[in-house]
């Protein structure tokens, strides 16, 4: 156990986050502060209000990235705030089994040993995945701890744990029995690596390709129909060509037939309003088995559906001589063969949008496959109830995006061709019956035999995570709880709906909308009261981070260099609702300097405490603002400013304006308390006891944002030790205070004092007097003021021997005019001529610099050829030079030296 003396010695060396963060975190976690009843001391014997927030479960394969860091930081800020407010708080942690990603990780390890999953078999392979999960999965959990977040770790859930497996089965069977889950042959998005994909798992990219004009000979004619396509390799599956019924060029051909190139198969010419007459030749091929739009056309016109390649993209017998070849690799060979036989009219450059797999980047193929789907009808009530105000989005504009997507919702393909994941709970009896069951090996209701054959596919990962808001609270988990329990019987009643969800806007449709429709459909209740969607974290230039750009920011490196508090505060202060976060070294340095400012303020207060009361005073530390009397004018003023900040921070947190809360704290602690409160205390040493108590309270106010340094400094000022006393994370959060006229008058008093001091310092700087003690300063005030209070602070801080209050401007003086006063210094021995010469020389240099920059920025060639960064640099230089020139001109006017 470390002694107080050792801790004090650490303080003298300077604040080092690495000395504090891991130690304080381990103590708080061990004491159970993060758990639901961790703040029971604040409940005061009453039934507390409940607050719940769900961690978006990161992939078990993942590591902490900067987007995670933002999500978890915001979640932890609001969780700490609610916990300190006395709420019974659940911050639910968890991990996602990440079907495709996890299976691929284990597959690579096995392949490196020369082992395939097929040689192992399904059960043995899944056992290997579980083995990997226990040994290597979940690295991100320890990284979260380094960030300082406080979820109830004892309740950590995994989307493949036994309880959640039961919840998944219950949801599937319930929807299946309601006819909301069906299996059928559908046109799906197909990745040759990852199998079926839902619509939102397809990412569209601009593709610079070709448009091929192919000749399809018209039956019993010497002429050909010119058909335009971007995918010539799919013509083997054509079962028709179509034209617009209003296209005069082709009306006479409707109902006739063409002969398919190379294969010689006869296919009809049909009319369909789907055809865009301006695209290509106005005539397009119809490939119902390999195109989303053609699939619908094929059904409308009863065309055959011919599949030409398998699940891996390999051509089958329907592709003739190209059987056994990969479809994309064969494209140039197919085009060459068509050209050799005179079937290519022309080829043009063409730009279009091509769908790619969101995970592996492969081109996605429309493919007819027997899959399981959740019907879109599950979403009907969810749309209406959100719009009735049962759930609120922050920022509010996300409601429009939610509505637009939900109203265009299609059936959701939920089956995946994997081994790792929630196996679809459908069983096939030898009698031909099909049963959806929550239990394994169910009894067939038709023939009464035990069914042993289960569906081979697993569910989309988003299916299980879509139940996260309530499955983690015990829904569907019956008889699968553990010791210690992962949930309690009353959890759903207390914590559902969840109070708040915080996540990135990029998974609004992947996850948030699906949780909403799942909660509404399965529990008849929306899963959240509020949903806060934050934007992206970008680099300092506003660029999206990517490995290819080399601009990835690793949060663990930031924590190692700056500490978790600096990263948390930086992310929070930059996170305005609806705006991307531009993270830079400069912004991190500002937050780091803030931590140093707090550390130095603590040292100053303790130094003065020791000077005033000796070692005994240091041993007692500073009191709490609720237990001492604040009597000095400075103490009373800083207390009013503290409560003003408290009111504003509380309002910001209640409305999820995290950046506003951080800005208010920064402004108060640095700009008001450190820059003015501590400075003014040099002229009011009796106020030190009061300022120390106020600063302790301010550290509690800041604590949700910067938990480690606030806890450490609070204990230093309190003369206590985290080893033997409670953390401030279970201290009551400062309460709001109603402002009155007396408070406003006190604020105005110190605004005047600060204004006079600032004015005198500005005047001394203009006259190059530096820190020289001035014999006399004349001050003309705009309104009556208590002179003794003014003299007490001004003479000490502005270094003035005599303060003379005047009603008019004295003779032979130079002055400074500000909001509340005019301050004057008699010229006496001041060499105005030397000052004037210096200012005029500076002005000439600046004027030359401005002329040069203006000429450069007005030069058309420079504007045309200069990189953007160079342009911005020169524009900034011009702005700064103009500001300096304006200041010099103002000083010359004030000194009466303008010429």
From Swiss-Prot:
Intervals of motif 'HIGH' region: 58-68
Coiled coil location: 836-898
Major location (coarse): cytoplasm
Assigned GO CC terms: cytosol
Locations listed in the record: Cytoplasm
Binding annotation for ATP: 547
Swiss-Prot/TrEMBL catalytic activity: tRNA(Val) + L-valine + ATP = L-valyl-tRNA(Val) + AMP + diphosphate
Record's keyword terms, sorted: Aminoacyl-tRNA synthetase, ATP-binding, Coiled coil, Cytoplasm, Ligase, Nucleotide-binding, Protein biosynthesis
Motif range ('KMSKS' region): 544-548
GO molecular function, one term: aminoacyl-tRNA deacylase activity
InterPro entries (alphabetical): aa-tRNA-synth_I_CS, aa-tRNA-synth_Ia, Anticodon_Ia_Val, M/V/L/I-tRNA-synth_anticd-bd, Rossmann-like_a/b/a_fold, tRNA-bd_arm, tRNAsynth_Ia_anticodon-bd, Val-tRNA_synth_C_sf
EC supergroup of this enzyme: ligase
Its EC number(s): 6.1.1.9
Disulfide bonds: none
CDD domains for the chain: Anticodon_Ia_Val, ValRS_core
Gene Ontology biological process terms, A to Z: valyl-tRNA aminoacylation
Domain comment, as recorded: ValRS has two distinct active sites: one for aminoacylation and one for editing. The misactivated threonine is translocated from the active site to the editing site.
Function: Catalyzes the attachment of valine to tRNA(Val). As ValRS can inadvertently accommodate and process structurally similar amino acids such as threonine, to avoid such errors, it has a 'posttransfer' editing activity that hydrolyzes mischarged Thr-tRNA(Val) in a tRNA-dependent manner.
PANTHER family: VALINE--TRNA LIGASE, CHLOROPLASTIC_MITOCHONDRIAL 2, VALYL-TRNA SYNTHETASES
Family of the protein in this entry: Belongs to the class-I aminoacyl-tRNA synthetase family. ValS type 1 subfamily.
Subunit note: Monomer.
Record-linked HAMAP family: Val_tRNA_synth_type1
Name of the protein in question: Valine--tRNA ligase
Gene that produces this protein: valS
């Amino acid at each position: 156990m470390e002694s107080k003396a050792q801790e004090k010695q650490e303080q003298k060396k300077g604040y080092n986050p690495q000395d504090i963060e891991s130690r304080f975190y381990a103590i708080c976690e061990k004491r159970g502060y993060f758990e639901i009843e961790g703040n029971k001391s604040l409940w005061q014997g009453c039934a507390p209000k409940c607050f719940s927030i769900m961690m978006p479960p990161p992939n078990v394969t993942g590591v902490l990235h900067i987007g995670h860091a933002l999500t978890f930081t915001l979640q932890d800020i609001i969780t700490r705030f609610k916990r300190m407010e006395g709420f019974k708080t659940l911050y639910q942690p968890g991990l996602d089994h990440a079907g495709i990603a996890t299976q691929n990780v284990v597959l690579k390890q096995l392949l490196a040993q020369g082992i395939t999953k097929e040689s192992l078999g399904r059960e043995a392979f899944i056992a290997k995945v579980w083995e990997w999960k226990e040994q290597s999965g979940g690295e991100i959990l320890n990284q979260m701890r380094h960030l300082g977040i406080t979820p109830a770790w004892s309740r950590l859930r995994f989307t493949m744990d036994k309880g959640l497996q039961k919840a998944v089965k219950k949801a599937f069977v319930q929807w299946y029995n309601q006819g909301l889950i069906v299996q059928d042959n559908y046109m799906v998005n197909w990745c040759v690596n990852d199998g079926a994909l839902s619509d939102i798992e397809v990412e569209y990219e601009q593709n610079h390709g070709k448009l091929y004009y192919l000749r399809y000979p018209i039956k019993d004619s010497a002429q050909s129909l010119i058909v335009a396509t971007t995918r010539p390799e799919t013509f083997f599956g054509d079962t028709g060509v179509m034209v617009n019924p209003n296209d005069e060029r082709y009306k006479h051909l409707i109902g006739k037939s063409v002969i398919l190139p190379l294969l010689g198969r006869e296919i009809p010419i049909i009319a369909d309003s789907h055809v865009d007459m301006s695209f290509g030749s106005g005539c397009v091929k119809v490939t119902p088995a390999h195109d989303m739009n053609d699939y619908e056309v094929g059904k409308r016109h009863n065309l055959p559906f011919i599949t030409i390649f398998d699940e891996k993209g390999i051509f089958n017998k329907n592709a003739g001589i190209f059987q056994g070849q990969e479809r994309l690799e064969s494209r140039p060979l197919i085009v060459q063969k068509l050209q050799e036989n005179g079937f290519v009219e022309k080829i043009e450059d063409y730009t279009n949008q091509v769908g790619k797999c969101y995970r592996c980047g492969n081109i996605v193929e429309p493919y007819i496959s027997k899959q399981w789907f959740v019907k879109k009808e599950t979403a009907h009530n969810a749309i209406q109830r959100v719009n009735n105000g049962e759930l609120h989005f922050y920022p509010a504009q996300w409601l429009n995006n939610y509505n637009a997507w939900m109203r265009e919702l299609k059936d959701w393909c939920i089956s995946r061709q994997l081994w790792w994941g929630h196996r679809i709970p459908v069983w096939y009896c030898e009698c031909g019956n099909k049963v959806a069951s929550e239990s394994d090996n169910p009894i067939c209701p038709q023939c009464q035999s035990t069914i042993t054959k289960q569906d081979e596919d697993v569910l989309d990962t988003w299916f299980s995570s879509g139940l996260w808001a309530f499955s983690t609270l015990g829904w569907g988990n019956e008889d699968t709880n553990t010791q210690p329990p992962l949930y309690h019987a009353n959890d759903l009643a207390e914590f559902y709906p969840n109070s708040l969800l915080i996540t990135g806007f990029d998974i609004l449709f992947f996850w948030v909308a699906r949780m909403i429709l799942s909660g509404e459909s399965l529990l008849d209740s929306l899963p959240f009261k509020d949903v806060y969607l934050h934007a992206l974290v970008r680099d300092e230039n506003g660029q999206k981070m990517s490995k290819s750009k080399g601009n990835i920011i690793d949060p663990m490196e930031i924590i190692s260099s700056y500490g978790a508090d600096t990263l948390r505060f930086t992310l929070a202060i930059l996170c305005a609702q609806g705006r991307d976060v531009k993270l830079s070294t400069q912004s991190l340095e500002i937050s780091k300097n803030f931590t140093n400012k707090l550390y130095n303020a603590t040292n100053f207060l303790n130094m003065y405490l020791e000077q005033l009361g000796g070692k005994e005073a240091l041993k007692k530390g500073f009191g709490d603002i609720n237990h001492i009397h604040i009597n000095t004018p400075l103490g009373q003023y800083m207390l009013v400013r503290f409560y003003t900040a408290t009111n504003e921070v509380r309002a910001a947190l209640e409305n999820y304006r995290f950046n506003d809360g951080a800005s208010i704290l920064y402004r108060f602690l640095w700009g008001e308390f450190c820059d003015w409160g501590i400075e003014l205390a040099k002229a009011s040493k009796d106020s030190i006891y009061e300022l120390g108590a106020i600063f302790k309270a301010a550290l509690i106010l800041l604590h949700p944002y910067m938990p480690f340094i606030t806890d450490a400094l609070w204990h230093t000022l309190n003369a206590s030790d985290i080893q033997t006393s409670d953390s401030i994370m279970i201290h009551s959060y400062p309460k709001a205070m109603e402002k009155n006229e007396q408070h406003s008058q006190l604020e105005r008093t110190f605004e005047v004092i600060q204004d006079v001091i600032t004015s005198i310092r500005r005047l001394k700087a203009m006259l190059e007097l530096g820190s020289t003690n001035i014999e006399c300063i004349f001050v003309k005030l705009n309104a009556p003021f208590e002179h003794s209070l003014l003299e007490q602070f001004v003479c000490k801080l502005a270094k003035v021997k005599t303060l003379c209050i005047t009603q008019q401007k004295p003779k032979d003086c130079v002055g400074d005019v500000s909001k509340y006063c005019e301050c004057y210094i008699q010229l006496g021995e001041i060499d105005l001529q030397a000052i004037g010469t210096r200012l005029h020389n500076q002005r000439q240099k600046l004027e030359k610099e401005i002329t040069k920059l203006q000429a450069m920025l007005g030069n058309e060639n420079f504007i045309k050829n200069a990189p953007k960064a160079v342009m911005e640099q020169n524009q900034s230089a011009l702005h700064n030079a103009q500001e300096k020139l304006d200041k010099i001109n103002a000083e010359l006017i004030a000194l009466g030296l303008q010429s």
